[in-house]
Each structure stands twice: as structure tokens, then as C-alpha cells.
Amino acid sequence: LFSPDKRYGTWRRLWVALARAEHRLGLPVTDEQVAQLEAHVDDEIDYAAVAEWEKKLRHDVMAHIHVYGESCPDAAGIIHLGATSCYVTDNADIMIYRDALLHIRSELVSVIAALCDFAYKYRAMPTLGYTHFQPAQLVTVGKRACLWAQDFLLDLDELNFVIDNLLFHGCRGTTGTDASFLSLFDGD
């Protein structure tokens, strides 16, 4: 999930989405160029070539653009057209974070379900309850497990809130302004 292949593969998917959108919006991006990007989106990434390009350019995103462009030469000129680096870096990270949070949520739901089963199974088994770390009165193991589950349910609510409010950063031009896109679209 947090591997280089996942991160840079997501960059490639974002470049395909950008090219597809730019084509639909009338920029000089052809169906053939988009198809070529799509055909090579899952190709193995040549990290040695990326390192060489990065050494020359001193720019990680541009290094990946060049390496991806080598595998789809007809589309090389439209990869990342008009976008800022943050379009791929930040949005890919958000997509990866979302995948991670969804995985955590799935595991958390499993823990809650297991605690519910445990609470039901031990609903009548007595145990000593405590207050302020002092022995107080009898409770059941099942009740105690319900309290643990309640804490996890609160965590689940917060996790759902974060997932629901994790926003894609959109697409901006170079330096985070719209200047490059305004230029590409002749000021419109």
C-alpha cells in the first residue's frame, strides 16, 4: 500500500485522468495519446532510469514524466500538461491515505464484530467491577466487553468522518495558479 510502485503507479493513473479530461475539454490531446498512456500505465517502472533523470533534472516528478514518456513516445509531450507537481504528489498521497484508512476501517469493523460476539458469549459471566481503580461491585465480562466495543465504535465514527471529508486537491497549473491552464485554453 505504501510502496513506491503504488505511489508512482498512482501518479501515472492521475496523468491518464488529466490527459483524458484535457482531451474532452478540447486541448490538443488525441484519443491515440490517451490510449497509449493507458496501455502503459501498469508497466514496470524503471527506477534506475528515474534516478538517472532525477540526477540530471533534480526534480522527481519530471524524472518520472520522462521515464513514462519513454514507454509512450507519442504521448510524452502531453503527460502532466499544464499541471503543477502537487497535482500528482499530493493527490496520489491522498488516494493512498484513503486506501489505508479504508483498510483500517475494515479491520476495525472486524474487531468490533469480534467484541460483540465475545460480549454475547460472556454476557452472564460475573467479574469484579472497579471504580477509581478500587474494587466496587459485580458486573459481567460481557458488559465490560461492550464498553470496549463502545470505544471502538467512537473510533469508527471518527474514522468515517475523516474518510468522508478527505478531499482531492483538484488540479492546478504550475506554481499552483491557473496561469498555465489559462494559457492552454487561450484565456478561457
Roles of regions detected by a PLM:
Residues 1-188:
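A helix-coil-helix interface module used to build multimeric assemblies
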